[in-house]
Design a protein with these regions (language model features):
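Short, charged, surface-exposed secondary-structure boundary motifs
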Residues: 1-3, 13, 17-22, 71-74, ...
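Class I SAM-dependent methyltransferase SAM-binding "motif I" and its flanking Rossmann-like core
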Residues: 38-108, 152-153
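A contiguous loop/helix-start segment that scaffolds small-molecule binding in enzyme catalytic cores
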Residues: 9, 22, 28-34, 46, ...
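Class I S-adenosyl-L-methionine
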Residues: 1-64, 163, 169-174
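Short charge-dense sequence patches
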Residues: 4-6, 21-27, 71-81, 111
């Protein structure tokens, strides 16, 4: 509903039910339906519920697993996720956590957060409250996996000002990575994407 803020779980459930009904209706007419979603479809609970409902209605369902931006964008920035304690926090979980309705984040290892540029102050506050140091290495990845991708290596406390200096719109999706791996020597060697000729 326009102007009422974030959708409630009821709104989301109703939307999911509407989409599912439309898919089943199209399938009942003998049409083939393709549902395109970004990233890995089964990381979205609504898509899983939708696919299950279509299967219960006795229609075939094929799933093509995708690659989630939560792992793809850090890899485009040369950040290796292997061999580290890694916590991945999607946008919905991030919003719950910074609003005080979720959980603390890991105070060690690598934390990767998908959020919006305008929420970085709250993200930093929550990370510090979870036990991270304000001067810990952090990376702000803007325009991830596009030819405009830029990775800023700063400290956790510098993230909000870095976004402001980069003139990011508040609603701009960003990925942040917090932890020592951001400054690992191999990261420079793994800067395979932004170092391409004619990049940007």
């Amino acid at each position: 509903q326009p102007g009422t803020g974030a959708p409630t779980p009821v709104d989301v459930d109703e939307h999911c039910a509407d989409v599912t009904a439309t898919v089943i209706d199209a399938a009942s007419q003998g049409l083939e339906v393709v549902r395109l979603v970004s990233g890995d479809p089964f990381l979205d609970g609504d898509i899983g519920a939708e696919a299950a409902a279509v299967a219960r209605a006795d229609y075939d369902v094929d799933v093509v697993p995708g690659v989630t931006g939560m792992t793809a964008v850090p890899e485009y920035a040369g950040l290796t996720l292997h061999g580290h304690d890694v916590q991945l926090i999607g946008d919905a979980a991030c919003q719950r956590d910074i609003a005080g309705h979720g959980s603390n984040w890991s105070d060690q290892g690598l934390v990767v957060v998908n959020t919006e540029a305008g929420k970085l102050k709250e993200v930093v506050k929550h990370a510090i409250e979870s036990g991270r140091g304000e001067d810990e290495p952090a990376a702000l990845i803007c325009h991830g996996a596009t030819t405009q991708q830029t990775t800023h290596t700063v400290t956790l406390g510098e993230l909000p000002q870095t976004a402001k200096t980069a003139r990011l719109d508040n609603a701009e999706p960003v990925h942040i990575a917090i932890g020592k791996v951001v400054e690992a020597p191999e990261r420079e060697q793994l800067d395979w994407y932004e170092s391409k000729p004619l990049f940007g």
